Design a protein with these regions (language model features):
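Small-residue-rich transmembrane alpha-helices that serve as helix-helix interface/gating elements
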Residues: 274-275, 330-346
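A generic, well-ordered mixed alpha/beta core segment in the N-terminal half of proteins
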Residues: 102-142
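Juxtamembrane helix-loop boundaries in multi-pass membrane proteins
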Residues: 3-35, 48, 52, 74-102, ...
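Extracellular/periplasmic helix-loop-helix junctions in multi-pass membrane proteins
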Residues: 39-42, 177-187, 247-261, 292-296, ...
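Central hydrophobic cores of alpha-helical transmembrane segments in multi-pass inner-membrane proteins
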Residues: 53-71, 129-139
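Generic multipass alpha-helical transmembrane bundles of integral membrane proteins
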Residues: 122, 126, 157, 161-285
Length: 379
């Protein structure tokens, strides 16, 4: 066996779900660019479509690598599930798929017509299944087999929980493209998915606040986790807004018809309140990050936490601008997208550097074995 073949085998064995956070960050970037600057920038349409295609290719590659790991090294699945940090990133698998299916709704119809909507609906149900599966599976292992201490807790606990509300937000967008009967099922299911995620995520945020007060900041390797709280708050807000927009048409002519206008109002008010909660965490995340930067931030795949949570918060801000007509939301949302693009550019460059040199392919759940490509890598 050649050196290159051994290297590929090592990469497969040490491939982790963390890599799907790259899909999350890239996906929310093209969605945010499409929403905040619709055809306003030279080459904007080509850029967003290009990022969508790039995101799909990455997702297919990452899926093939992860499945290859579990087929070739089946013992690593159990070790992953028992790892108190790596297992959390299983939630990134369905979350990374959501922007891709949204892209089929935004761009695919111009090429494939109604078939693009059918594919997006199929992907949505697949995504919903995975989100619910990991939303129960990972906490089960947390309760029964993983070892956790309050002082070691970080916001990564949110990852397997938040995926269901990300799917719910996508359901609000998908429902607009479907006939009323199907749209009603999608919207109703999405509200259930939202409820499976947001209340539990808010509970975790409360525990996280207590942990930070009692035990102060986590190690700088987990510094970026302070941005993750924006995820459930931004997506929770966005989900209420999008479902509120979709509900009147989806419920028309059904027993729930009278709830359509109510759902819209709840979406705006509830979305605004969650957005305000997120504003507190956005400021705090900046303050904590600047403090960490004085110590130096070591790069790892956790840096993708700079992107998706910020992106969904930006998307919620832009949706609030659309629903309320307040110019301030539009301006702030556009600035958040600029921040997102800057973060994405830096993190992508560092990621490709780590991929080329191999040090990012290092599974912590296998850290007691020899054969890791580099001591650095995944957080």
């Amino acid at each position: 066996m050649t050196r290159a073949q051994r290297s590929l085998k090592d990469i497969i064995r040490h491939f982790t779900p963390n890599w799907f956070t790259m899909n999350m960050g890239t996906g929310i970037l093209f969605l945010s660019l499409h929403e905040s600057y619709p055809s306003a920038l030279p080459g904007q349409d080509v850029l967003t479509r290009g990022l969508w295609l790039f995101d799909m290719v990455l997702y297919l590659i990452f899926t093939a690598l992860l499945l290859s790991r579990f087929v070739l090294f089946p013992d690593t699945l159990g070790r992953l599930l028992r790892h108190p940090v790596q297992s959390m990133f299983l939630g990134a698998i369905p979350m990374g798929l959501v922007p891709i299916l949204d892209g089929w709704l935004l761009f695919g119809g111009q090429i494939f017509g109604h078939a693009a909507v059918v594919l997006a609906e199929t992907l949505w149900w697949t995504d919903a299944f995975l989100a619910v599966l990991f939303g129960w599976l990972v906490p089960y292992f947390m309760f029964t087999q993983q070892e956790h201490l309050l002082e070691r807790m970080t916001a990564v606990w949110l990852l397997p929980i938040v995926s269901a509300e990300v799917t719910a937000a996508a359901g609000g967008l998908l429902a607009r493209h479907l006939p009323p009967g199907v749209a009603e099922v999608i919207v109703t299911t999405s509200y259930v998915l939202w409820a499976l995620s947001v209340p539990l995520a808010l509970t975790i945020v409360v525990i996280l606040f207590l942990r930070l007060v009692l035990h102060k900041l986590p190690h700088r390797d987990m510094a970026v986790s302070s941005w993750l709280v924006l995820g459930p708050l931004g997506t929770g807000s966005l989900g209420l807004l999008l479902l509120g927009v979709a509900a009147p048409a989806a419920f028309a002519g059904t027993q729930l018809a009278s709830l359509g206008s109510l759902a819209y109002g709840v979406g705006v008010i509830g979305g605004l309140m969650l957005w305000g909660y997120g504003l507190w965490w956005w400021v705090m995340a900046w303050v904590l990050t600047l403090r960490y930067m004085r110590e130096g931030l070591p790069f790892n795949m956790g840096w993708w936490g700079f992107t998706f949570p910020l992106g969904v918060y930006a998307a919620a801000t832009l949706q609030l601008a659309h629903e309320t007509g307040f110019v301030a939301f539009g301006v702030f949302g556009a600035l958040l997208v600029v921040q997102l693009a800057g973060f994405w550019t830096v993190v992508t460059a560092r990621t490709f550097h780590g991929m080329w040199h191999g040090y990012l392919f290092n599974a912590p759940c296998l850290s007691n074995e020899s054969g890791g490509l580099h001591p650095r890598g995944n957080a």
